[in-house]
Amino acid sequence: MKVKVVYLGVVRHKVGRKEEEYEVSEGSSLKDLLTKIVEAHIALKDLAGSLNDSQIDPTLIATLNGFAVNLNSSRNVILKDGDTLTLMTVIGGG
């Protein structure tokens, strides 16, 4: 299965690209994909935190096909062929 990943803001800056496509196995979870992304882009490790402990930085937010997803529950989200994951950080200021 192919899943498109779009990077915005700080995440795009750390990754160095706008988007890319990942090949994942049937039945893969969002956690599986996040692990692949961090392995490919070690600069995201600070935001992804410890994926094994589900302690992802709360400033990292994601949408899957345009709907918000809780990254700390990523092992419960099963991906489908053609999904689009968007990763970004919270924008703040004042």
Predicted regions and their residues:
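Ubiquitin-like/PB1-type beta-grasp interaction modules and other compact soluble beta-rich domains
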Residues: 1-93
